Amino acid sequence: MSKLEELIEKLCPNGVEFKNLQYLCGTITTGKLNANAMEDNGLYPFFTCDSNPFKINTYAFDEEAILISGNGSQVGHINYYKGKFNAYQRTYVIYDFKEINVKFLLHYLNGYLKEYILRNCKKGSVPYITLPMLQKFSVPVPPLEVQCEIVHILDDFTLLSAELSAELKARQKQYQFYLNNLLDIEKLKPQKIMYVKDLFEIKNGLNKEKGAFGKGTPIVNFTDVYKNRYLTKNMLKGKVTLNEREIKRYAVEKGDVFFTRTSETKEDIGMSSTVIEDIEKCTFSGFVLRARPTTDLLIPKFCAYYFSTNKVRDTIIRYASFTTRATTSGPKLAKIPVPIISIKEQEKIVNILDRFDKLCNDISEGLPAEIEARQKQYEYYRDKLLTFKELKVNE
């Protein structure tokens, strides 16, 4: 019998009590700042709804805390931090923990919060967290000795995953270096430089009532574009009910380049993704813009790589508008310069970058495959170790 099994047999053989999150921490609040309050080279972490914190020169919290993205493409993403930090007004900050090991709670939230959010949000809407929803999230509360032993086991898995992820991050940095250099306009010495307005027709996406989502025609959503440099049919999970007129008007074709239209932060505005294969009967969301090629001067994969270079990203950010959110539009994207080189040269660059892409992103081999395997192993043990029989209060 393992140490954990002995502790459970001794301390909670009949099950454990489940409690709502509001009873396990003294404070569940949000930050007060706009998402664009970050400062370059700031002294403190600034947590927004992005997966990684930015920097800022002021702090509003000095706590051991769990931070949860309240909306946006990373809704439900969880960070842990101990020390001085600041937070965006839609980022939840949880601290002053009672009866619960903060790392135990962290593992449990990572396992079950996102599913809970999707189950409790309004169908068809962009998922977001409300305070009552978070307060009512139910958590098993075994004795602290049991919690600590579970944390010890699961932390070993996450440590190994973190080491592998750090190695992959270094490889991705190298990949981005080659991407930026191979697609640098000055180094390419193009035949000529044109602009997006000369090469594409830009159109806003489809807006439908909430009840139309969930079945029907595949749809390119915000998250599909935000997370992927290029798109294939198998990557699309969302569906929407359309009539024939809408299917024709908001169609998706091979070579279409999509850009995210809004963002919580300026760094994430105008993320792009290119359709690299034919997709029959597909549409696109109003949260993205479609740039359809009007010439045959560019191949899809070249577009996929070019529009993700640092210089293009800088151009998109420079022309974007900022209020409480960052926004872009067709006329702003139209100003992006595009180098025109031969198809043969484009294919040569694509072949080089495809090899880097496979090394960094192909989950069937190398580091990505090992990270995927370790993550699945962690999730298996997390689900196994965090599953408890509920002990009723009167038992």
Regions found by a protein language model. Give the residues of each.
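A short beta-sheet element
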Residues: 48-52, 56-114, 122, 130, ...
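A short glycine-rich beta-alpha junction/loop motif
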Residues: 85-91, 123-142, 281-287, 321-342
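Amphipathic alpha-helical segments
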Residues: 15-17, 135-176, 183, 191-192, ...
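Sequence-specific dsDNA recognition surfaces
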Residues: 24-63, 67, 77-81, 87-89, ...
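Short, conserved secondary-structure segments in the cores of folded domains
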Residues: 12, 125, 209, 246-248, ...
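Long compositionally biased, domain-poor regions of proteins
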Residues: 81, 104, 110, 115, ...
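Non-catalytic DNA-recognition/assembly elements of restriction-modification systems
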Residues: 8-31, 37, 41-43, 48, ...
